[in-house]
């Protein structure tokens, strides 16, 4: 038997006393009263903040949304299947935030900014709050630089500027995502960081978008935030704010960003589900009273920053799905009133083969020609006017058979202009190509062609001008104006190609 001497015992006790740490930890804890449907009710947690993160015993994280007199309503950021009644919950003292860094470019992440593309961890030294205040009035300046989508119909008649919020609205399967992804593809070489947020989409649809961006080299400057249809409602509700926080990180570093929310109807549905389960009073269409604030605080974060803050910008393209063209439903009207214009995609036009199926009549950009280069303003005015007159005449022509020659000519011109606006998916055009295309149509060069020949001719014309008249593109890109010299080069090129084309067609 080992015997300890008295001085050894006193040494051990002295060491233990020296090692004793007097730190007192006060942990704000509570007990689970009820759990289910992605919601937990907690008793205790007396000093919890609204929106604070709480941690359950088995590791699930939740957000305290309802602070009631005798319990706290928490939404879970996981399935919560292992949470039991009576288990303990502790407040973390933190509001939801995500790590941010340049390393996120080219990655696919979830609403908590964790990678889901199987390519390992993402290193980040900084973090940002998911919900941060939007820039104030003094921090902004008016939108003046164009953000080209590569789609003639949008860039000429519904122009989008850097820092603008433009809603893309339409029924299901009308090409809303296609317009958004084409815009991302067109930012190649424009020094714009793109963030694509997929909310409640099918995983196969998200994979398709990611693949198409990868094939065309667009993932290099793009971040995809995805919460698919099987994700908890809490994460679908948070995904847009995560995307906005990432875009803001780049915006405040003097860069230009484009963020696409696809789509906000699904986010509103996820928020409605959470609110009803938390027993908040339902309003119109069973949405909670603060569903307007849900979207307004998100979209107000898009801005063109002032020169003091570095002139960075964040352009938002929210997408909203309508039911059988009903633009006057609750969520569409809310988002229309928050944004700076809308691009309306029509199922009838889509089915008639007019793609992109943009209804130019009811689409609008509230920034307007401030977001266009001078050369585009010069050619787009005539296009708008002629298409508006054509739409009016077309409706009238259905009732009248004997039309005079001038009316017939105007109808023929309108049909060719409508043909000129058609574009294949994933084939965005540069602004110089758009200007030459519109100029060809509005100045009557297409009037002598059959409608079926228009697109074929325009494709050949673009190739011909690129190889034989490169000075046209050089003048437009350097001066941003359709000068007399550029116009004469363009006229010459169109005439030459038209003669060649008509000869080919005769053979």
UniProtKB/Swiss-Prot annotation:
Enzyme class: translocase
Site (Required for activity): 363
Modified residues (Phosphothreonine): 257
Domain of life from the UniProt record: Eukaryota
Membrane topology note: Peripheral membrane protein
CDD domains referenced in this protein's UniProt entry, alphabetically: ATP-synt_F1_alpha_C (cd18113), ATP-synt_F1_alpha_N (cd18116), F1-ATPase_alpha_CD (cd01132)
GO MF assignments: ADP binding; ATP binding; proton-transporting ATP synthase activity, rotational mechanism
Binding partners and assembly: F-type ATPases have 2 components, CF(1) - the catalytic core - and CF(0) - the membrane proton channel. CF(1) has five subunits: alpha(3), beta(3), gamma(1), delta(1), epsilon(1). CF(0) has four main subunits: a, b, b' and c.
Family: Belongs to the ATPase alpha/beta chains family.
NCBIfam families assigned: atpA, PRK13343.1
Record-given protein name: ATP synthase subunit alpha, chloroplastic
């Amino acid at each position: 038997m080992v015997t300890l001497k008295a001085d050894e015992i006193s040494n051990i006790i002295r060491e233990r006393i020296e090692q004793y740490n007097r730190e007192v930890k006060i942990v704000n804890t509570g007990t689970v009263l009820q759990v289910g449907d992605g919601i937990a009710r907690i008793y205790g947690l007396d000093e919890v903040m609204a929106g604070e993160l709480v941690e359950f015993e088995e590791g699930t994280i939740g957000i305290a949304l309802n602070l009631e007199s005798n319990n706290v309503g928490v939404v879970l950021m996981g399935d919560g299947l292992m949470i039991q009644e009576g288990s303990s919950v502790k407040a973390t003292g933190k509001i939801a935030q995500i790590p941010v860094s340049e390393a996120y470019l080219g990655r696919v992440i979830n609403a908590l900014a964790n990678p889901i593309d199987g390519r390992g961890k993402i290193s980040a030294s900084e973090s940002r709050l998911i919900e941060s205040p939007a820039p104030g009035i003094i921090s902004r300046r008016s939108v003046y630089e164009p953000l080209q989508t590569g789609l003639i119909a949008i860039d000429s008649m519904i122009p989008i500027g850097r820092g603008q919020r433009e809603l893309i609205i339409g029924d299901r399967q009308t090409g809303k995502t296609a317009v958004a992804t084409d815009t991302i593809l067109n930012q190649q070489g424009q020094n714009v960081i793109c963030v694509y947020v997929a909310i409640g989409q099918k995983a196969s649809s998200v994979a398709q978008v990611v693949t198409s961006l990868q094939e065309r080299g667009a993932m290099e400057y793009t971040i995809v935030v995805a919460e698919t249809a099987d994700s908890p409602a809490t994460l679908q509700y948070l995904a847009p704010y995560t995307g906005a926080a990432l875009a803001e990180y780049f915006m405040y570093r003097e860069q230009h960003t484009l963020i696409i929310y696809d789509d906000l109807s699904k986010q509103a549905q996820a928020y409605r589900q959470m609110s009803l389960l938390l027993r908040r009073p339902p309003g119109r269409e069973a949405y909670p009273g603060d569903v307007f604030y849900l979207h307004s605080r998100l979209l107000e974060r898009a801005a063109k920053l002032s020169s003091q803050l570095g002139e960075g910008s964040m352009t938002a393209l929210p997408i909203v799905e309508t039911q059988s063209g009903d633009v006057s439903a609750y969520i569409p009207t809310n988002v229309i009133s928050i944004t700076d214009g809308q691009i309306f995609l029509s199922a009838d036009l889509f089915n008639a083969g007019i793609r992109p199926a943009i209804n130019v009549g009811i689409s609008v950009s509230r920034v307007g020609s401030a977001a266009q280069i001078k050369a585009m303003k010069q050619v787009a005015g005539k296009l708008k006017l002629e298409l508006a007159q054509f739409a009016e005449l077309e409706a009238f022509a259905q009732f009248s058979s004997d039309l005079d020659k001038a009316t017939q000519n105007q109808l023929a011109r309108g049909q060719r202009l409508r043909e000129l606006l058609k574009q294949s998916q994933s084939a965005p055009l540069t602004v110089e190509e758009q200007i030459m295309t519109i100029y060809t149509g509005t100045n009557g060069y297409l009037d002598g062609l059959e409608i079926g020949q228009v697109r074929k001719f325009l494709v050949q014309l673009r190739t011909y001008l690129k190889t034989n008249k490169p000075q046209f593109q050089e003048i437009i890109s350097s001066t941003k104006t359709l000068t007399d010299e550029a116009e004469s080069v363009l006229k010459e090129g169109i005439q030459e190609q038209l003669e060649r084309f008509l000869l080919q067609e005769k053979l």
